[in-house]
Amino acid sequence: MNVLWIIALVGQLMRLVQGTATCAMYGNCGKKSVFGNELPCPVPRSFEPPVLSDETSKLLVEVCGEEWKEVRYACCTKDQVVALRDNLQKAQPLISSCPACLKNFNNLFCHFTCAADQGRFVNITKVEKSKEDKDIVAELDVFMNSSWASEFYDSCKNIKFSATNGYAMDLIGGGAKNYSQFLKFLGDAKPMLGGSPFQINYKYDLANEEKEWQEFNDEVYACDDAQYKCACSDCQESCPHLKPLKDGVCKVGPLPCFSLSVLIFYTICALFAFMWYYLCKRKKNGAMIVDDDIVPESGSLDESETNVFESFNNETNFFNGKLANLFTKVGQFSVENPYKILITTVFSIFVFSFIIFQYATLETDPINLWVSKNSEKFKEKEYFDDNFGPFYRTEQIFVVNETGPVLSYETLHWWFDVENFITEELQSSENIGYQDLCFRPTEDSTCVIESFTQYFQGALPNKDSWKRELQECGKFPVNCLPTFQQPLKTNLLFSDDDILNAHAFVVTLLLTNHTQSANRWEERLEEYLLDLKVPEGLRISFNTEISLEKELNNNNDISTVAISYLMMFLYATWALRRKDGKTRLLLGISGLLIVLASIVCAAGFLTLFGLKSTLIIAEVIPFLILAIGIDNIFLITHEYDRNCEQKPEYSIDQKIISAIGRMSPSILMSLLCQTGCFLIAAFVTMPAVHNFAIYSTVSVIFNGVLQLTAYVSILSLYEKRSNYKQITGNEETKESFLKTFYFKMLTQKRLIIIIFSAWFFTSLVFLPEIQFGLDQTLAVPQDSYLVDYFKDVYSFLNVGPPVYMVVKNLDLTKRQNQQKICGKFTTCERDSLANVLEQERHRSTITEPLANWLDDYFMFLNPQNDQCCRLKKGTDEVCPPSFPSRRCETCFQQGSWNYNMSGFPEGKDFMEYLSIWINAPSDPCPLGGRAPYSTALVYNETSVSASVFRTAHHPLRSQKDFIQAYSDGVRISSSFPELDMFAYSPFYIFFVQYQTLGPLTLKLIGSAIILIFFISSVFLQNIRSSFLLALVVTMIIVDIGALMALLGISLNAVSLVNLIICVGLGVEFCVHIVRSFTVVPSETKKDANSRVLYSLNTIGESVIKGITLTKFIGVCVLAFAQSKIFDVFYFRMWFTLIIVAALHALLFLPALLSLFGGESYRDDSIEAED
């Protein structure tokens, strides 16, 4: 008896040593419904399961791993192990790329189902009856160690699922953000959706009353575990570290290095300047150019104010004399043959007008406006469109409540009706609707509608439950799939993660039809939305594919330009009046008509060469040419008036010819400087800007020709018929302002130089603060509906634009090339495309996981994913999805597929399996390539010639963001020297200019300044004065640059051309004064001070009246333009130019010339004023 007791005791001890089972569940006891799953039977803790059979043990090892090989007792039957295997295989296609996550996932459910100590961490809390009237588990608690759960979640959270361009966690964990959400999703009862057949509640901190239980805390593997290491794309810890990017901005504290250097240099120069000024003042004891109470006559400046480089020259300027003689003959021919000149002019205008009406076209396509067809990015866009199809036509609508949450049940009801009408009923004039044009992921799919309504598949939810349902769908989008079967993340639909408190929701419709039918439907959509009655407190903004081009074309400021013309005409009529106050109405009209004629001639001439105009050219060029062209009319007319005063014995023709001889070299010099600057601007490759520069150049040339011929003829005819007798007398009244106010300011010329120099150096400090970009809201009229849309995109859109990495000419049938692309396998190159892009997500604007078709293709072949690549047994025929599993076998057998890529197809096999994959649907295998990748590859029977790998930028909310995103795309795509590839995104083509805009700006402005110096040196025959002219123009541009930073004028191709134009206009302010200072009558004193006074006496009035005030009046009108692009880039820049250039020309330049000006030449063509 004792022996039997001892044997029994030993047996019990052996069972304990070998792991006697403590079960909570064992076996299956039936279903809750006909279509439900088999549910386990609850068992008491005293229950002892039988020893595992060899067959069950072998199956358990196959499913759960080698560590189960020695297990003799388990809390599961063979049927449960089979069911466990089937359920685990559902998750394998999603997480098998990360062995650590897969191992942890399998371990959790293997222990939950079969562990011998199951009863120690599983507590059944609810039992129900099956259809067979047996007890079945309905709800239970699992006690889980929180550290184990956290490491489990961390091993899985970054696994990418390329087919959705998202994360596997979105599918297996409902988008969980932490381990508790992850396990809650896994444990929530979802029997009809393929989830848990009963409720599993995971608990992490045992309460006092739960101390009898133990926490599940088996071995867990990190994603960078040596044995189960995951690929870089799925595990940040496994990734190599990229070299840090060089910071392109040098700063010392908050200051750019350039600004700090300028400040230091400025401080040193300022000390020397004040010392110089103080010593000069002390030495001269306050001496000035003129006595405060005496108004000087020409040549009466204080001789103590000597030029630093004073020299005298009584020679004539040979080049100036030749030009004067040439244009004297032109003027003589014009006054002697006025009718021939005018008839020829009218005939030319008629011919060019005919050409315009017959052949001229306006360029309105935004792409053709902003990107050169020779641009690399334009060619890349063409390549993408030709090979992968044009990007979707996008219709996007924002519904916004700026004061509170946008969502209420009333809003839902209203929007469900609106959206249903748009997608189902709204039709164009051709009876074409959204269903006829929309994007469908597959041929048998429904239309893609990216809207929160699709969480409910377009059916209005119940009033009592809509908030709860919407929140659940927002947390777990995979549970609320729309009819097109793609999860919709909340960042795509709402302005905030807290969707019930979001201020806006976004609806996006996608069209793939790029025909006139799509245009007409979009026009109908636009009409409908503009007339849509919106509930109180809400507003909508929207954009259709045709909106931008249409609104740009509606940007009509012709009335503003017309008013500008009228204002300058009225001013010209007044400013050209005679000394007795009588106006010269005809001359004012003539000047205006000549400007218009030059524009017409230029447009017709360029039309012959196929150069298209744009709306901006049509609206801005007239103003620009009027602002430039009217100046020469003032110069000619004022010089003629001076001849009338000084040479009354001359005939009218002689006075006009003399005026032309005197002013023509100056006019030609200014004309060449301006046209040269405009031609330099033509080097900008952006078509709108390039064409603008060409039109400006040709218009200025025609304007100059017509002014020196047609206007001269009109002036001759007008003066002869008016029979005007010159009034002579004292000119002190007329010149009193200049002689008392202006010249007194000039007496402080050293102080003026110090002030302007300080201004210049201060401006240099601000230059690094100039921002790059061209805000889209500036390009459209301010009353356009697109203004609100662009603002809402920046404020409320939480998804960034897509990026496509296009790889060409790479033979992917070879293993070595496959390893340059892949990311999910252990032998992928360390710096493969997938690995580098995974790392770039952490430091660049590209933040979405890469949709890597090659990885998905190879994962599709994984035999563990037995619903993916299948062949009919014994044949090479593909098993259709509906074919029973027993009649199919996986393409690769167990053991022939490995994460080290051994056995992966190459050569001909690669293309054969590719054909199977690319035609496979996503159901039942999510890795099937047809839906996500059917348009991502260009291939034939032997090779893949090109393919795209999709990712996306983070939300871009400013022009700076867009520029940085473009730079990132270019930088990353160029970091693979062994690959023929480029990055493409629909917006890239508009940001090409910014890649080299900074250096280009310096080159073009520098070239323009050098050109001015060269031309002025040729005309003036004086290096020193030419240098001072170029210096003053440089200072004008630098000061304008600083004001651009302060006034919020960004640098882009438009403002760059304006800067070049500013160089040309800045020359106009200064060049006539410099030439008048250099070429003087023989009777004028040759010292610098006397020449400055002579220049201001003769040219100063024309600069003020003909140049400064004319431009000021014309520019001010632009402030009332509808388009902000006029306000910012034309009104602000040109207004700034007028003020800055006038101050420099009328104050700084005379002071500079009087101190440092070059030698003079005698002008024998005129006599000095008395």
Curated annotation (Swiss-Prot):
Gene3D superfamilies: Multidrug efflux transporter AcrB transmembrane domain
Listed Pfam families: ACR_tran, NPC1_MLD, NPC1_N, Sterol-sensing
UniProt membrane topology term: Multi-pass membrane protein
GO terms under biological process: sphingolipid metabolic process; sterol transport
Disulfide pairings: C23-C75, C29-C41, C64-C110, C76-C114, C98-C230, C101-C156, C223-C235, C232-C239, C438-C447, C473-C480, C822-C828, C868-C925, C869-C891, C879-C888
Molecular-function GO term, any one: sterol binding
Domain of life: Eukaryota
Glycosylated residue positions: N123, N145, N178, N314, N401, N513, N900, N940
GO cellular component: a single term: endoplasmic reticulum
Keyword field: Disulfide bond, Glycoprotein, Lipid metabolism, Lipid transport, Membrane, Signal, Sphingolipid metabolism, Transmembrane, Transmembrane helix, Transport, Vacuole
SSD domain span: 557-717
Subcellular localization, as worded in the UniProt entry: Vacuole membrane
Signal sequence annotation: 1-19
Membrane-spanning segments: 260-280, 341-361, 556-576, 585-605, 616-636, 667-687, 698-718, 752-772, 1000-1020, 1027-1047, 1054-1074, 1099-1119, 1133-1153
PROSITE patterns assigned: SSD
Entry similarity comment: Belongs to the patched family.
Task of the protein: Involved in sphingolipid trafficking. May recycle sphingolipids between cellular membranous compartments.
Leftover remarks: Present with 521 molecules/cell in log phase SD medium.
Name of this protein: NPC intracellular sterol transporter 1-related protein 1
Origin species: Saccharomyces cerevisiae (strain ATCC 204508 / S288c)
